């Protein structure tokens, strides 16, 4: 039985090193899809590179934890910038949901301005779209726009409440991450999905070349290791051997 495998590289537009890593992992590896931060410092560079790589599917990486928002967000910013204090606001049930709704729409329109087309799908930086307060907003928006959505079903208490026309992969994994990156780990993710009977799977990754921006990230050198693994010829063969076809959210 053939299964769909989407290998999505997050953080397109974060930095030039990140952008080059994603393009390399697409051109010479198994990355089929990426998601772009429209407020990233290297987003224009990402747009330019993407023009020479038409096979790379591009979605939108909704950002509520980094950089400057596109709209005025007094309820979520400090000194005009976004940050990880969003977790505290979520715990206090104090998220400015109307502001978040407007920012989502603005980032979506900015994506279309930059890339000249709709994103293939939506996900988010640091998975904030899976917050219980935010998820219904993003799910409704994706369904209305006819685009797919990354769904990590583990935090969902009831995915029966999803919009009927919302598209997503059956499975999602963020396990290909950390200090123990290897081909074995990647293939274990596939085997676990197969055992669950999932016909489609998205695997999240972050391949990059290290530059000054990536050096400042808490997740730095493992991005290089990811790039090595994702461009391995033996991994591509092992994926096909397991009955997976590489694709994107266009195929969901």
Curated annotation (Swiss-Prot):
GO BP, sorted A to Z: chitin catabolic process; diacetylchitobiose catabolic process; polysaccharide catabolic process
Cofactor names: Mg(2+)
UniProt enzyme class: hydrolase
Subcellular location: Cytoplasm
Subunit structure: Homodimer.
Protein name: Chitooligosaccharide deacetylase
UniProt superkingdom: Bacteria
Binding site residues for Mg(2+): 61, 125
Assigned EC number: 3.5.1.105
Pathway: Glycan degradation; chitin degradation
Gene Ontology CC: one annotated term: cytoplasm
Family statement drawn from the similarity comment of this UniProt entry: Belongs to the YdjC deacetylase family. ChbG subfamily.
Annotated PANTHER family: CARBOHYDRATE DEACETYLASE, YDJC DEACETYLASE FAMILY MEMBER
Organism: Escherichia coli O127:H6 (strain E2348/69 / EPEC)
HAMAP family the UniProt entry points to: COD
Matches recorded under InterPro entries: COD_ChbG_bac, Glyco_hydro/deAcase_b/a-brl, YdjC-like
Keywords: Carbohydrate metabolism, Chitin degradation, Cytoplasm, Hydrolase, Magnesium, Metal-binding, Polysaccharide degradation
Known catalytic reactions: N,N'-diacetylchitobiose + H2O = N-acetyl-beta-D-glucosaminyl-(1->4)-D-glucosamine + acetate; diacetylchitobiose-6'-phosphate + H2O = N'-monoacetylchitobiose-6'-phosphate + acetate
Protein function: Involved in the degradation of chitin. ChbG is essential for growth on the acetylated chitooligosaccharides chitobiose and chitotriose but is dispensable for growth on cellobiose and chitosan dimer, the deacetylated form of chitobiose. Deacetylation of chitobiose-6-P and chitotriose-6-P is necessary for both the activation of the chb promoter by the regulatory protein ChbR and the hydrolysis of phosphorylated beta-glucosides by the phospho-beta-glucosidase ChbF.
Keyword Acetylation tagged: no
Any one GO molecular-function label of the UniProt entry: deacetylase activity
């Amino acid at each position: 039985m053939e299964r769909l495998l989407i290998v999505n590289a997050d953080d397109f537009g974060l930095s030039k090193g990140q952008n080059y890593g994603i393009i390399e992992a697409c051109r010479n590896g198994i990355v089929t899809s990426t998601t772009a931060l429209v407020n990233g410092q290297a987003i224009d560079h990402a747009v330019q590179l993407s023009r020479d790589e038409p096979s790379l599917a591009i979605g939108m990486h909704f950002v509520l934890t980094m950089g400057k928002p596109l709209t005025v967000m007094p309820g979520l910013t400090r000194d005009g910038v976004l940050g990880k204090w969003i977790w505290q606001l979520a715990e206090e049930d104090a998220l400015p949901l109307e502001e978040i709704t407007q920012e989502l729409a603005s980032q979506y329109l900015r994506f279309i301005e930059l890339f000249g087309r709709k994103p293939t799908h939506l996900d988010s930086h640091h998975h904030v779209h899976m917050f219980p307060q935010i998820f219904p907003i993003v799910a409704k928006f994706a369904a209305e726009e006819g685009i797919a959505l990354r769904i990590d079903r583990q935090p969902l208490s009831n995915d029966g409440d999803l919009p009927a026309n919302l598209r997503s992969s059956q499975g999602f994994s963020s396990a290909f991450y950390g200090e123990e990156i290897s081909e074995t780990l990647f293939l274990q993710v596939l085997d676990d999905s197969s055992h669950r009977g999932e016909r489609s799977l998205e695997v999240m990754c972050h391949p990059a070349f290290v530059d000054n921006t990536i050096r400042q990230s808490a997740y730095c050198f493992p991005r290089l290791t990811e790039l090595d693994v994702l461009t391995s010829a033996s991994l591509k063969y092992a994926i096909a051997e397991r009955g997976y076809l590489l694709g994107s959210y266009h195929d969901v």
